Amino acid sequence: MIKSLFNIRPAEKHPVFLLFSMFFFIVFASITGSAMRDAIFLIHYDKTYLPIMYLFVAITMILIINLYNRSSEGKNQLLLLIITGIIFSITLLAFQFFLSGIAIPLFYVWIEIITIFSVMQFWLVTGDIFNSRQAKRIFPLIIAG
């Protein structure tokens, strides 16, 4: 039924399923990570520091996205997605062992970076896989993930 509703062609079936699943897990990890980030931060710091954290996130994202854009130009987006996924996993594992003091605000900012980068890279990869005509049919299904 979904195949006929979205007019998914046989060659598109596997990429659509993988991207649907991937987006589901990105959203799941983002929601879970943000809740955990907020809880850990608010246990150790007063809520009045949250606006400062939002500012740090914005400044950090401007710097990192500019750096990423310069260094990723002309590179394989899927490979970059895999590499950043490995880096994110290793750093999250490291935070488990050092999550105290100044590492808590750093963790707050880092979770937001991971969330934004994961979504951004997902759509860059997805845009490389499908042309604009396919995207009009398929993206609504993928977004439902």
Identify the function of each model-found stretch.
Residues 1-11:
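Short, Lys/Arg-rich, polar N-terminal cytosolic tail immediately upstream
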Residues 47-48, 132-142:
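Loop-to-transmembrane helix entry/capping segments in MFS-fold secondary transporters
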Residues 36-37, 115-131:
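Intracellular juxtamembrane helix-capping segments at the cytosolic ends
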